[in-house]
Amino acid sequence: DVTEKSRMKGIMVDNHIPTAEYMVYHNLEEIDWKKVTFPSVVKPVDCNSSKGVHRVDNIDEAKKYAAEAIGLSRTKTGLIEKFNSGNEIQVDCFVTDEKVEVIMTRQKQKIIAENGMVLQSFGSIVPAPLSDALMKEVEDIANKIAKGFKLKNTPFFYQAIVSEDNHINVLEFAPRIGGGLSYYLIKMVTGFDIVEAAIDSFLGNKVIVNKKQAKKVYSTNLLYMHPGVFHHIEGFEKLKKENIIKDLSLIHI
């Protein structure tokens, strides 16, 4: 239920977790195109990360990427959902036996999608600039996710859109630590070692969530490059010494 997006969306609807309107399909012929509004997002139901996720702005793009989604899906199933404009956030959480804790929030910086571009992020702002009312909604949604999906003693995170009129729509969630350097960022910002907590939960040890409020605003920045031979980076050590940059990681793909 947590790796297949159509079942995930169904459980969200059943548990009153706000999420975008959607339809599931197995072939293009069963799609009622009169019900598809634009812009929309097309994706396979069971691929990881942003693989096969496209914003579509017209029927031709929708048909093209709907067919691609079927081809990428292990179960040959795609999903079309309403595109909600606004700021994308990620909410990192940990649920113990007793309660759900929101550990950290971040606002993603998104590449402006055009010409069928895969939706990706080029960085984030930590913590996300959310009002007290929105933080209360963030916490309520985290509790609904934990209850609806019967989560106990596990890290999880969810991604959502905060609309211009301050409503939250959940995109998806995963019962694990966020990918990439999330574990490092969470520990640096909040002091909470989410990897150690996850291991303790797997071993049956009691997890105590001790975290601190972020005293600074952090920015992560992803630099994408064209294929080539990497040589070196200049100026990083100087910026790190001056405490302008906290750290840098090189990821080879």
Regions found by a protein language model. Give the residues of each.
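Short, conserved loop/turn and helix-capping segments at secondary-structure boundaries
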Residues: 2, 56-59, 185-192
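Short helix-to-loop capping/linker segments positioned immediately adjacent to catalytic or ligand/cofactor-binding
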Residues: 77-78, 144-149, 206-211
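Conserved protein kinase catalytic/activation segment
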Residues: 167-168
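Short beta-strand-to-loop capping motifs
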Residues: 57-58, 93, 223-226
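Active-site nucleotide/adenylate-binding loops and adjacent lid/helix of ATP-dependent enzymes
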Residues: 3-79, 84-86, 96-98, 128-144
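ATP-dependent carboxylate/phosphate-activation module, predominantly the ATP-grasp catalytic core
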Residues: 82-89, 93-151, 155, 162, ...
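Peripheral (often C-terminal) accessory segments that flank ATP-dependent C-N-forming ligase machineries
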Residues: 31, 197-251
